[in-house]
Amino acid sequence: MFNLQIIPVSVFQQNCSVVWDNEKNAVIIDAGDDADKIIRFVEEQQLNVQKLLITHGHLDHIMAVDQLRKHFNVDVFGSHQNDQPLFEQLPNICQSYGLPASPAFLPDHWLNAGDKIQIGALTFHIRHLPGHSPGHIGFFDFENKIAFSGDVLFKDSIGRTDLYQGNFEQLIYTIKTQLFDLEDDFIIIPGHGSHTTVGREKQHNPFLK
């Protein structure tokens, strides 16, 4: 069985997702900040965190990752290596937003299109989703028809392309080839805001007409 709790974190209200199976094997996706809040939820639910996953290297998706890696003693997977400069420059990027400097770190494992992540009974397939950032990836659970797609597609909107190596044309191509090929009832968990479905965005998203 698939279990999901979204924990809004950071001043950016980023959707940190905690996912677990019936045996309480868990993964945390995009721990953007507020590590104590995430740890408290995990402990309350008595979850066994096995991996930390990252869709992309923007600060609001990674500021708590290194702290959680040390706390849970687990490996970090993702994003694609094209986002490496964002991890290396994290302290400076934090300060440019007027935030306390989070230490630079690198994931233990970069991920590529076609890779798979297994957490207990759950399997996530990796797709490369460039456009918002060059190394952006998504985690797709085809059995449960749910995708954790970071800041690529939102309800009625799309990701920014004015940040490091963002590209509007590439983002639109990514959405149409890597998300809109899914079934209409496939659920999209974005990096910010409420969830949506592929079918809804095909019909109503003004950026994708």
Name what the model sees in each region.
Residues 34-117, 204-207:
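Active-site HxH/HxHxD metal-binding segment of metal-dependent hydrolases
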Residues 7-8, 107-108, 128-130:
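Short Gly/Pro-enriched turn/cap motifs at secondary-structure boundaries
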Residues 24, 33, 59, 83, ...:
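Short, glycine/acidic-enriched loop or turn micro-motifs at the edges of active sites
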Residues 28-29, 50-57, 76-80, 128-131, ...:
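Active-site neighborhood of phospho(di)ester-bond hydrolases with catalytic His/Asp-centered motifs
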Residues 93, 122-209:
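Metallo-beta-lactamase
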Residues 17, 109, 114-115, 137, ...:
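Residue-level detector of beta-strand structural context in well-folded domains
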Residues 3-5, 48, 75, 109, ...:
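Conserved beta-strand segments of alpha/beta enzyme cores
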Residues 1-45, 138-150:
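Conserved beta-strand hairpin/beta-sheet module of binuclear metal-dependent hydrolase folds
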